[in-house]
Swiss-Prot record:
Pathway: Purine metabolism; 7-cyano-7-deazaguanine biosynthesis. Zn(2+) binds at residues 199, 214, 217, 220. InterPro entries: QueC, Rossmann-like_a/b/a_fold. Binds 1 zinc ion per subunit. The lineage of its organism: Bacteria, Pseudomonadati, Pseudomonadota, Betaproteobacteria, Burkholderiales. The gene is queC. Keywords: ATP-binding, Ligase, Metal-binding, Nucleotide-binding, Queuosine biosynthesis, Zinc. The keyword Ribosomal protein does not apply. Signal peptide: none annotated. This is 7-cyano-7-deazaguanine synthase. It is an enzyme of class 6 (ligase). NCBIfam families: 7-cyano-7-deazaguanine synthase QueC. ATP binds at residues 13-23.
Length: 239
């Protein structure tokens, strides 16, 4: 990975595995990195608690880049719009349009727009998000084409060149675990395994091999499968 120490990044940090890995990726690449979280009225607040533990844990590890301030914005308009299993107390199900009801329409578009506004104020020129087309549920605001178009729109909107980086766009969950290992070794993998939150049902409970969660929701299943694939590959490689 080539380093760009002169650039300053803002990482969208939710408290999950993907965004935590992206934070490590940014610290390995850029000279100065800040973090941004959103309280959007999500049903399960546990991911917001996990954010701070992840930040503290990442700060304790050695990185080429400097980890700067954390920022939190309240965006309760998404909960007001409702209709998603992420904001409303409803069972996870498929919608008539073929998308799961865990999709929060416009969420990533809004998050990146607010991130661009904050980056403008903070003198940051790179926005980093954990979106992926490889292991995802078809969310249209996670697509590479969507985010490339958004980069153009945001740069025009603030009259300043912004780069939207999505280092996991073409990586599977197994690849994401492998990337964390390359970036921060066993210490980072263990931090993400124990402190990040993925479960759609908000469960922490028992610590599984792959981390906390119910083990049955789509997010837990994807994370567990990725862990199993990655650890199996490591065993084959003698790691």
């Amino acid at each position: 990975m080539s380093r760009l120490p002169q650039r300053r990044a803002l990482v969208l940090l939710s408290g999950g595995q993907d965004s935590a890995t992206c934070l490590a990726w940014a610290l390995a690449r850029y000279g100065h990195v800040e973090t941004l979280g959103f309280d959007y009225g999500q049903r399960h607040r546990v991911e917001l608690d996990c954010r701070q533990r992840l930040i503290d844990g990442v700060r304790a590890l050695p990185w080429p880049g400097q980890l700067g301030p954390d920022h939190m914005l309240t965006v309760d308009v998404l909960a007001q719009l409702g209709g998603s299993a992420m904001t409303d107390d409803v069972a996870i199900a498929m919608q008539a349009d073929g998308l799961p009801n865990t999709f929060v329409p416009g969420r990533n578009l809004l998050f990146f727009t607010l991130a661009a506004a904050l980056a403008y104020r903070r003198g940051l020129d790179v926005l980093v998000g954990g979106m992926s087309e490889t292991d995802y549920s078809g969310y249209p605001d996670c697509r590479d084409s969507t985010l490339k178009a958004l980069q153009v729109a945001l740069s025009l909107g603030v009259d300043r060149p912004l780069t939207l980086e999505t280092p996991l766009m073409w990586r599977s969950k197994a690849d994401t675990w492998a990337l964390a290992q390359r970036l921060g070794g066993d210490a980072l993998v263990e931090l993400i395994r124990c402190e990040s939150h993925t479960c759609y049902l908000g469960q922490r409970g028992d610590l599984h091999a792959w981390g906390h969660g119910c083990g049955g929701c789509p997010a837990c299943e994807l994370r567990a499968q990725g862990w199993e694939q990655w650890t199996a590959q490591r065993s084959l490689n003698g790691a």
